[in-house]
Swiss-Prot record:
GO terms for biological process: defense response. The keyword Transport does not apply. Probably participates in a plant defense mechanism. This is Cyclotide vodo I3. It comes from Viola odorata.
Length: 28
C-alpha cells in the first residue's frame, strides 16, 4: 500500500518488491 515513487511501465516496476496497481508502483 505504500507508493514506491514511480509509475509502472508495461505493468512492471523497477523497484524490487513493488507491484503495479492502477498505473503506479506500490509496496504493501
Amino acid at each position: 500500500g505504500v507508493f514506491c515513487g514511480e509509475p509502472c511501465i508495461k505493468a512492471s516496476c523497477s523497484i524490487p518488491g513493488c507491484e503495479c496497481i492502477a498505473g503506479l508502483c506500490y509496496k504493501n
